[in-house]
């Protein structure tokens, strides 16, 4: 699949590897076929997932409702789906 895949209907799915309890929220580039994202939130009671979705939405200039977690709720490796942005725009906004 690669780290990013266009879906029928215009949405984009991509894989991320989350590092919780980091010193700041940031995108660190590609690591092992996934986008590495560092988050300050701890991996407790869904806090890191919520912070991840909010951070990705803000980074892409989207509303939180346009970003959803598709797979990996309890894993560091997650698959997200976004609407309202092209694959090319996604790469540019993440500087990949």
From Swiss-Prot:
SUPFAM superfamilies: YggU-like. Transmembrane segments: none annotated. Gene3D superfamilies: YggU-like. GO terms for cellular component: cytoplasm. Belongs to the UPF0235 family. HAMAP family: UPF0235. This is UPF0235 protein Helmi_20270.
